[in-house]
Amino acid sequence: MPNKRLMLLLLCIIILVAMIGFSLKGGRNTTWPEKVIGDTTGVFQNIFHTPAEFFAGIFENINDLKNTYKENERLREKLDGQTQYEAKLQELEEENKSLRDELGHVKSIKDYKPILATVIARSPDNWAKQVTINKGTQQNVAKDMAVTNEKGALIGKIKSSGLNNFTSAVQLLSDTDRNNRVATKISGKKGSKGYGLIEGYDKEKKRLKMTIIERKDKQDVKKGDLIETSGTGGVFPEGLTIGEVTDIESDSYGLTKVAYVKPAADLTDLNNVIVVNRDVPTVDTEEEGS
């Protein structure tokens, strides 16, 4: 029995080889067995080709999707880096502008020794009264030294009670303490108009209260007049900008005029400041004092 099966298998192989040989010869018609084999082969090729092509397309789409995802991730990282770069550039531009303003003010107070400092603390309970800066006695900061913002507008003076080796407390102009006085000079479009004395801060109006002490040639103090330090009190040097007059009233007795002054510095937003170091001893007087 095994021999018969082997003989049958060999016979089939011989017939198949013979048919292939005949099919390779040109110039003859295709036999029906060849047609059957060709049709059968074509059917199976068609059956397997379509799914194979379908799955090949799926794998190709998946590969394209992976490549697209990687490209999107790369572009997103690049965009994030660009955004961070732009934010850093904006920060540096603002810092550069602030430093330029400080430099310009330093040149304008060349008669004094400026000490550049940064506000490092501000208590919510004393928000309008004082700020803390990062310079102290080790950097030659002393009590009653005038302090300005980066544009040169007066914001206050160094408090003796808050003076340490490496930090200092600055008493702001917006402190309502009536002893927080500043001797002032009043100037209009045509020059000096007289002198005054800032004696406090009105929280409701958000203005400094200045008593008009002397008027030159009886000139009237008007809205828009410039108020600067006069330098006569022995604490604040002359010529520091304080603000401008926004309103004028008579006192409760009708004897003197009181001007309300809008500070030139934004006392609610302080960052970089300048301590004005004068080489003259400070003098405690009734006009200017702590």
Curated annotation (Swiss-Prot):
One of its GO terms (cellular component) is plasma membrane. Residues 58-111 form a coiled coil. The keyword Chloroplast does not apply. Its main location: membrane. InterPro entries: Cell/Rod_1 (IPR042177), Cell/Rod_MreC_2 (IPR042175), MreC (IPR007221), MreC_beta-barrel_core (IPR055342). Disruption phenotype: Loss of viability. Cells lacking sufficient quantities of this protein undergo morphological changes, namely, swelling and twisting of the cells followed by cell lysis. A polymeric material accumulates at one side of the division septum of the cells and the presence of this material correlates with the bending of the cell. After prolonged depletion in the presence of MgCl(2), the cells become very short and fat and eventually spheroidal, but no significant lysis is observed. Addition of sucrose results in rounded cells. Cells are still capable of making division septa. Keywords: Cell membrane, Cell shape, Coiled coil, Membrane, Signal. Residues 1-23 form the signal peptide. It is found in: Cell membrane; Cell septum; Membrane raft. The keyword Membrane applies. GO terms for biological process: peptidoglycan-based cell wall biogenesis; regulation of cell shape. It comes from the Bacteria. Self-associates. Interacts with MreD and proteins that belong to class A and class B high-molecular-weight penicillin-binding proteins (PBP2b, PBP1, PBP2a, PBP3, PBP4, PBP2c, PBP2d, PBPH and PBP4b). Belongs to the MreC family. Involved in formation and maintenance of cell shape. Required for the formation of proper helical filaments of MreB and for cell wall synthesis in the cylindrical part of the cell leading to cell elongation. This is Cell shape-determining protein MreC. The gene is mreC.
